[in-house]
Amino acid sequence: MKQKSWNIHLEEMMEAGVHFGHQARKWNPKMAPYIFTERKGIHIINLTQTARFLSEACDLVANASSKGKQFLIVGTKYQAADLIESSALKARCHYVNQKWLGGMLTNWSTIETRLQKFKDLENKKKTGTINRLPKKEAANLKRQLDHLQKYLGGIKYMTSLPDIVIIIDQQKEFTAIQECITLGIPTICLVDTDCDPDMTDIPIPANDDARASIRWILNKLTLAICEGRYNSIKN
């Protein structure tokens, strides 16, 4: 698939606050190549670098989705949870937006067992089986179902390990990144000025705290995924 510009405009990134990094004293020196300047104690991200890596990420996901590859989007910070869900649903991706359960990828066989239990409980609820049980037992099963829906609902239809994982906050999702590294699963990760860009395959230098910044980056990535799928159908 030939490279595209993906309509990545510096003005839009500035409006979304993509360029605002963390306090300079909290920086990771490995982010130096991606920092433009320091202003009032805050590092300012070089948006030319953001555009370069975001474009590379969009090329990768568009090409992968055109070949039927599966994606997992991970972001459990409270200000991003709803954005993760809506973006994933729009692009028909799997997602984790509440809590990363240790071993979600590295102990996939156990997660598969829990997903099967989740589906069984859902089926019992739909058929009314749960409501025919003794009150205490029914309440217990409903609690289990709510818990599984909250933490595994976004990967309910994931039947194997994902081909690419998109991660919103490197610091918060450190365990997820480590699992991807262990399994050799490629990652695309938003990296703020306090992150380590060497831990991910495609680092996208960006503000990983502001909703507008997260939304803007996710929108570009999910549009690229959708375009890749559309092109595979068209061809």
Curated annotation (Swiss-Prot):
Q: Does the keyword Nucleotidyltransferase apply?
A: no
Print the keywords alphabetically.
Answer: Chloroplast, Plastid, Ribonucleoprotein, Ribosomal protein
Tell me, in one coarse class, where this protein mainly resides.
plastid
Task: Spell out the subcellular localization from the entry.
Answer: Plastid, Chloroplast
InterPro entries, alphabetized: Ribosomal_uS2 (IPR001865), Ribosomal_uS2_bac/mit/plastid (IPR005706), Ribosomal_uS2_CS (IPR018130), Ribosomal_uS2_flav_dom_sf (IPR023591)
Coiled coil region boundaries: none
On the tree of life, the source organism's domain of life is Eukaryota
Q: Which Pfam families match?
A: Ribosomal_S2
GO cellular component terms, alphabetically, are: chloroplast; small ribosomal subunit
Entry's Gene Ontology molecular function annotations: structural constituent of ribosome
One Gene Ontology biological process: translation
Q: Which family does it belong to?
A: Belongs to the universal ribosomal protein uS2 family.
The protein in question is named Small ribosomal subunit protein uS2c
Organism of derivation: Marchantia polymorpha
